[in-house]
A protein has these predicted regions:
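Extracellular/secretory pathway-exposed regions associated with glycan biology
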Residues: 1-40, 44-135
Length: 135
């Protein structure tokens, strides 16, 4: 995740009218909590998403019968320490195009919430590229 790159924008998924070369995506970076408490991660996605913290799968949402459908899923609470950077990996898979005549961009968002943090986008100040980024 690059701090100046939006991470919650629709992806250019394949459609019958405009095939896109990108059918999967992977974001790697680091995340820092504001408070030492349990955080819940939420994924809004129309296909399939996996969210990992420090290499451990904390959230997975699969496409229903390999067909896209918009749904929100939440992780179990994850304990994080204030100011400590942890690795975050988000993987996305576009399963199939929408039916002819139905134009829909792919969607995927990752939010967080905690006792002190209202559910919403993870602020850019709490994200940074992984070590060795650009080297």
């Amino acid at each position: 995740l690059h701090p100046v790159t939006p991470y919650n924008v629709p992806l250019p998924g394949a459609t019958p009218h405009s095939a896109a070369p990108l059918k999967t995506a992977k974001w790697e970076g680091q995340l820092k909590a504001e408070f030492s408490e349990d955080y819940t991660f939420h994924a809004n996605v129309d296909n399939e998403v996996w969210v990992f913290l420090d290499g451990k799968l904390i959230l997975h949402r699969g496409a229903y019968r390999r067909r896209p459908c918009w749904v929100s899923v939440a992780s179990d609470p994850i304990p994080l320490k204030a100011g400590q950077w942890v690795r975050i990996d988000v993987r996305y898979k576009e399963w199939r195009a929408w039916p002819v005549g139905f134009s829909q961009a792919s969607h995927m968002q990752v939010h967080w919430s905690s006792a002190s943090t209202k559910r919403g986008s993870i602020p850019c100040k709490n994200l940074r590229p992984p070590p060795q980024f650009g080297k």
